């Protein structure tokens, strides 16, 4: 048998340079962002800060500042594991993932709460269910913290960010299961409609959106 090889096209090496906006003092910037939210925090509250499974640059510094800001209001910060089905959707799996990222009570000075039980809290007009982890009902206020970026699998007005953190992350295994059961064309609608349902039912104070540059 004769082997036929196709000639390779001509190639050239290139160098691509991306825009590189930077925040030189991460802690100072995070303190400034938290000042927008702290007027809504009352002494004695328990405030849940979401933590997820994605590796985000400088996330420990940002979480540390958020914990300090909440505590400075006379409130008690807790870290709510919010990663959908990651970590196998189990409490121990979630803890293992967070431990690997350095997100621990010892490092950040706030309890880390894992949970694998979800509750249906409502339904959208289009028949989508809003799920929420039981752990979210143990706090007086929720502040989602997440990176905002384009999604690798679908395009829409809302992709990866704070809405997805609420719908899929805090939605736990139930929210993640519904998300992954739908076609790509339906996912932006799910994120928008279910987020509206969650905001109407849960004490979400606001969120911190993180943007990373290409480096």
For each feature predicted by the language model, list its residue ranges:
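Catalytic cores of enzyme domains
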Residues: 132-134, 142, 148-215
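Short glycine/serine/threonine-rich phosphate/pyrophosphate-binding segments
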Residues: 56-63, 88-89, 151-154, 165
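Short glycine-rich or small-residue beta-strand-to-loop segments that form or flank ligand, phosphate
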Residues: 46-55, 78-85
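Glycine-rich phosphate/diphosphate-binding loops that line cofactor/substrate pockets in enzymes
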Residues: 33-48, 71-74
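N-terminal amphipathic/basic leader segments beginning at the initiator methionine
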Residues: 1-29
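An acidic, phosphate/nucleotide-engaging active-site surface
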Residues: 93-157
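Active-site histidine-anchored catalytic micro-motif
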Residues: 76-92, 123
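Histidine-anchored nucleotide/phosphate-binding helix
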Residues: 57-77
